Curated annotation (Swiss-Prot):
Residues bearing the modification Phosphothreonine: T185
The name this protein goes by in its record: Serine/threonine-protein kinase 16
Catalytic activity: L-seryl-[protein] + ATP = O-phospho-L-seryl-[protein] + ADP + H(+); L-threonyl-[protein] + ATP = O-phospho-L-threonyl-[protein] + ADP + H(+); L-tyrosyl-[protein] + ATP = O-phospho-L-tyrosyl-[protein] + ADP + H(+)
Gene coding for it: STK16
PTM info: Mainly autophosphorylated on serine/threonine residues. Also autophosphorylated on Tyr-198. It is uncertain whether palmitoylation is on Cys-6 and/or Cys-8.
Record-linked Pfam families: Pkinase
Result for mutant: C8S: Loss of palmitoylation
Amino acid sequence: MGHALCVCSRGTVIIDNKRYLFIQKLGEGGFSYVDLVEGLHDGHFYALKRILCHEQQDREEAQREADMHRLFNHPNILRLVAYCLRERGAKHEAWLLLPFFKRGTLWNEIERLKDKGNFLTEDQILWLLLGICRGLEAIHAKGYAHRDLKPTNILLGDEGQPVLMDLGSMNQACIHVEGSRQALTLQDWAAQRCTISYRAPELFSVQSHCVIDERTDVWSLGCVLYAMMFGEGPYDMVFQKGDSVALAVQNQLSIPQSPRHSSALRQLLNSMMTVDPHQRPHIPLLLSQLEALQPPAPGQHTTQI
């Protein structure tokens, strides 16, 4: 584990014997803050995620998030630059130093286009989808599931390549639920950690004897694909109106007709949004179908976003 030292008077912090200059705040969540910092040793920008740890469990979860990052060396999964635990009296902060992506998230891109009355092209969608699937394939191959895939958790690199972030909700891919108590525990966990409008149907009402597997990510991927196609998630408006998302996801999704999209893309989306998880495809099958559609290679002008 690295060591952190705050040098507040100079607006710098030291992590693993390297000094970083605070530039500005990037955002904040319930118990975390993200700052833009510059490495004074290399001139590169980084995102410093600071997680407030009130209890031992918080520290363990932050450590686990760092461990999840360290499992992967993959172009479509966010890498961890450094991790440390900072202590100030009874207060603890877990610091995750991450690469900074100036283009922001996939959601930022969807919103930017929507503001101009535009959408991602099908070629762009296919290329992005391929990268997201490859990231998920790597996660699933290690025996884990992401569990909180959504457009705001997908960064865009300099060439527009998708990079999966926020690994704090990751857990084992295959969960054998045996009994009502375990089912309720998992359901409560999902309510806290899996964004409601991207949450798979099987996580809203967990059965007392069932298997929850990595295909919860495939449902979420379908919601991401829908957002890329139509500028909003399939259940965003349901949630915003205050209607029941849990009820809405129990019915097969009706996909709007659009001349922008091929029947093959619509069929792909339809398969991801299969309510019965046992009938939902795994990522390797989706990858083979995507590769058969032959999206343009990275760097070709049609894929640039």
